[in-house]
Amino acid sequence: MPSLRAHVFRVPADGPDDVAGVEALFASGLQANNVVAVLGKTEGNGCVNDFTRGYATRSFETLFSRYGVDGVSIIMSGGTEGALSPHWTVFARETVETPGERALAIGVSRTPALPPEHLGRREQILLVAEGVKSAMRDAGIDDPADVHFVQIKCPLLTSRRIAEAEAAGRTVATHDTLKSMGLSRGASALGVAVALGEIDATSIGDADICTRFDLFSRCASTSSGGELTDHEIIVLGMSAKWSGPLSIDHAVMLDAIDAHSVRKARERLPENSRLAAVLAKAEPDPSGRIDGRRHTMLDDSDIAGTRHARAFVGGVLAGIFGITDLYVSGGAEHQGPPGGGPVAIIVEKEQ
């Protein structure tokens, strides 16, 4: 009986418009129409005015259009602080004449556009929850316990979007565009938690978003940007309907230095395997302390705390895995416990 097979490629980038490495994959045999998603780390500031995300997205849209391919999920996360390396992670899938044997599964979906007045509110949570369920169906994953990472690109509020909403007589959750990034990430993460049965949707209200950090998802990774108005969703997990050498597991870091949990997750994966990708979330602990010691990431008026966190957690993970092309996304509201976050590890078994 046929099955689906996933492929994962980590490609270096010399800039947000450098898609040559991915085009080289196409030249060497990867079918462009088999690509379902591209995750990128671009070298902007990762904040509201980070235009490297949109630049990279447009570069990939142009590339895929040359091959007649449409509908690829293109999710760009800005910020390669510290020694993090700009890169792309390309996810592809194909049907093969091999029985399913429980392997990495990939599913994608997009939600309808989110009205600005719904951003950071309960409506966004419910919209994302439906999108995650759709992506799980696309991946052939029935059990939420088999989901190990849910990557979401969500919108933010710009001055123009705020003005348009208010001109229509509607109110928005905040007038602070930077704060809107956190609200959007947080609501999207809670949507993941609802979809996976980690939280009861009836128990969450607008006031809980980015305030009740005891509510979180074990595997949500959300990144906000001004280059979209909907949500792009990628679900990664394990499914018996898939075959191939790729496997995934994940850890939930309890704080920014919780290397132990990450190492334990790696140990659960096949020993005779090579690292295919590492995907992680990072945030400054809102308590202002890590393991009881004070940090100053939240007190820096020049550099956003999310930028500090990406650099810090990136260094921790680089020390564990020995690579710097790590997908580390900042801002982990409701994505793991406060100050922590999920880390997904994808490996390829040696043949």
UniProtKB/Swiss-Prot annotation:
Record's keyword annotation contains Membrane: no
EC number: 3.5.2.15
Keywords (A to Z) from UniProt: Hydrolase, Magnesium, Metal-binding, Plasmid
Pathway(s) per entry: Xenobiotic degradation; atrazine degradation; biuret from cyanurate: step 1/1
Disulfide bridge positions per record: none
Catalytic residue list: K153, S223 (nucleophile)
Annotated spans, RU C: 246-351
Site positions per UniProt: Important for substrate specificity: T306
Metal-binding among keywords: yes
Enzyme superclass (EC): hydrolase
UniProt GO molecular function: cyanuric acid amidohydrolase activity; metal ion binding
Ranges where the record places region RU B: 103-240
InterPro entries the UniProt entry points to: AtzD/Barbiturase, AtzD/Barbiturase_RUA, AtzD/Barbiturase_RUB, AtzD/Barbiturase_RUC
Positions that bind substrate: R53, S77, G78, R185, S223, S224, R310, S329, G330
Residues that coordinate or bind Mg(2+): E283, A332, Q335, G336, P337, G340
Record entry for activity regulation: Inhibited by barbituric acid.
GO BP field: atrazine catabolic process
Region RU A, annotated ranges: 1-96
Family the entry assigns: Belongs to the cyclic amide hydrolase (CyAH) family.
Function: Responsible for the hydrolysis of cyanuric acid, an intermediate formed during catabolism of s-triazine based compounds in herbicides such as atrazine and polymers such as melamine. Catalyzes the hydrolytic opening of the s-triazine ring of cyanuric acid (2,4,6-trihydroxy-s-triazine) to yield carbon dioxide and carboxybiuret, which spontaneously decarboxylates to biuret.
Record note on domains: The monomer structure is formed from three repeating units (RUs) that share the same structure as one another. The monomer, the active site and substrate all possess threefold rotational symmetry, to the extent that the active site possesses three potential Ser-Lys catalytic dyads. It is possible that any or all of the three active-site serines may act as nucleophile (albeit only one can do so per catalytic cycle).
Subunit structure: Homotetramer.
Record-given protein name: Cyanuric acid amidohydrolase
Species in which this protein is naturally found: Rhizobium leguminosarum bv. trifolii (strain WSM1325)
Taxonomic lineage: Bacteria, Pseudomonadati, Pseudomonadota, Alphaproteobacteria, Hyphomicrobiales
